[in-house]
């Protein structure tokens, strides 16, 4: 997904109603976020912010190097993401240390960007919204749901990961039932793009209404 454009809503005003968009790997979060964006909704994506935070010269990258060693860098001095992913998914302790470095910074930046918006509502894409127990940063939680078998098929086709790597990622995320229990709203992404589009448009109208109620 391209970097979000905040115009024309990047002006001080009443704070936007915040919808937290989450779901497991391969559930279709980026596609749903893109549809919301095409409907004119500002989207703030945690993964995009995370990539910005670990660019060369950023304090977060320096702290990661201090924690993991310089072997975590590639030849150009940037973060070797594949090596980092391997390390954190084979060590719970290293995963926890990485999260302690990145999560507070990501959430702080998401909050900062959200306060600049005057749109009726915005979407905060947070893959680990349920896991980090920070639901209070959003007004409503929208979960993208996908059956387990379809999820594994899509991830394997998209990311070219081994079954072992996929299982490690899934273990690091909340079980499907836990995500669904935390949801205020659910989009089921198990058919085609047209069906997905209709579901997003339905919730778009719902969130416009909820945002108007909050502002009154």
UniProtKB/Swiss-Prot annotation:
CDD domains: DPCK. It catalyses: 3'-dephospho-CoA + ATP = ADP + CoA + H(+). SUPFAM superfamilies: P-loop containing nucleoside triphosphate hydrolases. ATP binds at residues 26-31. One of its GO terms (biological process) is coenzyme A biosynthetic process. Residues 18-214 form the DPCK domain. One of its GO terms (cellular component) is cytoplasm. Keywords: ATP-binding, Coenzyme A biosynthesis, Cytoplasm, Kinase, Nucleotide-binding, Transferase. InterPro entries: Depp_CoAkinase (IPR001977), P-loop_NTPase (IPR027417). One of its GO terms (molecular function) is ATP binding. Its EC number is 2.7.1.24. Catalyzes the phosphorylation of the 3'-hydroxyl group of dephosphocoenzyme A to form coenzyme A. This is Dephospho-CoA kinase. The gene is coaE.
């Amino acid at each position: 997904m391209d970097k979000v454009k905040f115009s024309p809503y990047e002006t001080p005003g009443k704070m936007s109603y915040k919808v937290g968009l989450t779901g497991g790997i391969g559930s279709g979060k980026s596609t749903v976020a893109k549809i919301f964006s095409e409907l004119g909704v500002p989207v703030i994506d945690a993964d995009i912010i995370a990539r910005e935070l670990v660019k060369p010269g950023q304090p977060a990258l320096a702290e990661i190097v201090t924690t993991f060693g310089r072997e975590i860098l590639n030849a150009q001095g940037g973060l070797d993401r594949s090596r980092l992913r391997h390390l954190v998914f084979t060590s719970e302790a290293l995963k926890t240390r990485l999260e302690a470095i990145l999560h507070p910074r990501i959430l702080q930046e998401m909050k900062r960007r959200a306060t600049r918006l005057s749109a009726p509502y915005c979407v905060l894409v947070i893959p680990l919204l349920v896991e980090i127990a920070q639901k209070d940063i959003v007004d409503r939680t929208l979960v993208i749901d996908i059956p387990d078998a379809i999820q594994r098929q899509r991830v394997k086709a998209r990311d070219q990961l081994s079954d072992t790597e996929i299982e490690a990622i899934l273990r690091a995320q909340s079980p499907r039932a836990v995500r669904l229990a935390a949801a205020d709203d659910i989009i089921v992404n198990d058919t085609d793009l047209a069906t997905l589009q209709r579901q997003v448009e339905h919730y778009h109208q719902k969130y416009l209404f909820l945002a108007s109620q909050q502002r009154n």
